[in-house]
Amino acid sequence: MKTIYDIIIRPVLTEKAVKDNEKKNTLTFEVDMNASKTEIKEAVEKIFNVKVKEVRTLIVKPKPKRFGFRSSGYKKAWKKAIVKVESEKPINIAELV
C-alpha cells in the first residue's frame, strides 16, 4: 500500500510553477506514475492541510540525454500533477522544502 509520501515524490520548483503558485494558487508536484487523481488530492490535503479544488495530471515524455561522446540514452518519463487549492493566500513551497 502506498503512503502519502510515496505518492508525492517532490515539488516542481520551476519559474513557471512558482509564478502559477502566486497568481493561480496552484501547487506542482512530481508524483508516482501509478497514482490516481483522488490519491493525489487526498495526499495534498493531508500534508498541507488545505482544501483541493482540482487536480490535473500529465506525463512528461522522456528526453534524450548524452553520456560522454558516443553513448546516449533517455531520461525516464515522469508524471506531473498540478493541484489547485482553495486557500486565500498562496502556499510558499520553497519555504516548506
From Swiss-Prot:
Disulfide bridge partners, by residue number: none
One Pfam short name: Ribosomal_L23
UniProt GO MF annotations: rRNA binding; structural constituent of ribosome
Gene Ontology biological process: translation
A GO CC annotation given for this chain: ribonucleoprotein complex
Entry keywords, A to Z: Ribonucleoprotein, Ribosomal protein, RNA-binding, rRNA-binding
Domain of life: Bacteria
Family: Belongs to the universal ribosomal protein uL23 family.
Description of how the protein assembles with itself and partners: Part of the 50S ribosomal subunit. Contacts protein L29, and trigger factor when it is bound to the ribosome.
Name this polypeptide is given: Large ribosomal subunit protein uL23
Organismal lineage: Bacteria, Pseudomonadati, Aquificota, Aquificia, Aquificales
